[in-house]
C-alpha cells in the first residue's frame, strides 16, 4: 500500500490506509514504526478503515526532528480533523498510547474508543534505563522481531529516540485520565520489562469505565508477541459497542 503524507506546521506524518468501515488509527511507540502493526492490520481492516501512522521522525517519516508527545498528539488531532474522521478508534502502543491519551482528551467528540497497549504516560524512571531498556524489552517477547526493533531505532536515530524518551518521561497524563470519555481498553503483556503491568492496572483504574486485560507470556510489544489474542481482544471490545448501538437503534 502506497504511503501518503500529512503535513501541518512544518511537520510531516507518513501513513497508509487499508480497509473500509469506521476508522481505526494505529500509533506506534518509541523507536518504532507503523510496521510494528503488520500482524494486526489484516484482522482490524476486515471491517474497519485502518490508518497506520509513522510518527514524525520515525519510519517513513524519518529525517525530521521528533515531536514531543503533546505536539505529536496535536498533529494527530489535526489529522483526524482534516480527514474528517468520525467515531475514531485510537490504538496506541507504548509512547503511541501516551500520545493517543492526549488525542482522546483533545478530541472527545471524535474519539469513540481508546486502546492503550503497554502505554507510557504514568511511567517514571531514569532516562538511561528507559532508552537502554528498549532492546531488552523486545527480547522478552518474540525474538524474530528484534531485527525490526533495531532497524527502526537506527532509522529514527539516537537523537530522536533520546529526545522522545526525555519528553515522555517529563509528561505525566494522570490529571487527564479521569476526563477521558472514550470507551477504553487497556492491554498489557504480563512479561513487559519496560512498562510494568502495575502501570497498566493504574491507567485502567484512573480512566472511567476502562477495562484491563493482561496477556500471559507476552512482553512489551504485546501486539507482536500475541497478535491473535490482541486482535481478538480489540475486535471483541469494538463489537460490544456495535451490538449495543444496534440494540438502541
In which residue ranges do the predicted regions lie?
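Alpha/beta-hydrolase fold catalytic core
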Residues: 1-24, 45-49, 85-86, 155-156, ...
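Conserved HGGG/HGGXW glycine-rich cap/lid loop of the alpha/beta-hydrolase fold
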Residues: 11-62
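Conserved acidic catalytic loop of the alpha/beta-hydrolase fold
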Residues: 71-88
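Flexible "cap/lid" loop of the alpha/beta hydrolase fold
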Residues: 98-106, 110-142
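Hydrophobic, aromatic-rich cap/lid helix
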Residues: 146-175
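Short alpha-helix in the alpha/beta-hydrolase fold that links the catalytic acid
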Residues: 173, 182, 196-205
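Short beta-strand/loop motif that positions the catalytic acidic residue
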Residues: 180, 186-188, 192
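Catalytic histidine-centered segment of alpha/beta-hydrolase-like enzymes
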Residues: 218-231
Amino acid at each position: 500500500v502506497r504511503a501518503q503524507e500529512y503535513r501541518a506546521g512544518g511537520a510531516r506524518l507518513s501513513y497508509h490506509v487499508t480497509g473500509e468501515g469506521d476508522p481505526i488509527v494505529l500509533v506506534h511507540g518509541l523507536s518504532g514504526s507503523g510496521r510494528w502493526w503488520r500482524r494486526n492490520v489484516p484482522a482490524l481492516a476486515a471491517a474497519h478503515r485502518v490508518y497506520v501512522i509513522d510518527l514524525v521522525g520515525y519510519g517513513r517519516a524519518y529525517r525530521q526532528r521528533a515531536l514531543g508527545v503533546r505536539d505529536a498528539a496535536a498533529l494527530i488531532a489535526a489529522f483526524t480533523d482534516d480527514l474528517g474522521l468520525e467515531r475514531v478508534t485510537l490504538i496506541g502502543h507504548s509512547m503511541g498510547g501516551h500520545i493517543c491519551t492526549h488525542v482522546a482528551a483533545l478530541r472527545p467528540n471524535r474519539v469513540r474508543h481508546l486502546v492503550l497497549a503497554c502505554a507510557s504516560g504514568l511511567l517514571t524512571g531514569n532516562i538511561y534505563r528507559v532508552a537502554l531498556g528498549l532492546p531488552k524489552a523486545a527480547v522478552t517477547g518474540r525474538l524474530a522481531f528484534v531485527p525490526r526493533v533495531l532497524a527502526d531505532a537506527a532509522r529514527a536515530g539516537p537523537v530522536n529516540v533520546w529526545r522522545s524518551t526525555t519528553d515522555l518521561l517529563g509528561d505525566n497524563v494522570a490529571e487527564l485520565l479521569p476526563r477521558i470519555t472514550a470507551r477504553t481498553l487497556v492491554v498489557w503483556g504480563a512479561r513487559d520489562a519496560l512498562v510494568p503491568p502495575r502501570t497498566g492496572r493504574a491507567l485502567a483504574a484512573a480512566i472511567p469505565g476502562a477495562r484491563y486485560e493482561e496477556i500471559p507470556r507476552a512482553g512489551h510489544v504485546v501486539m507482536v508477541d500475541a497478535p491473535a489474542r490482541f486482535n481478538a481482544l480489540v475486535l471483541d471490545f469494538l463489537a460490544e459497542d456495535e451490538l449495543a448501538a444496534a440494540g438502541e437503534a
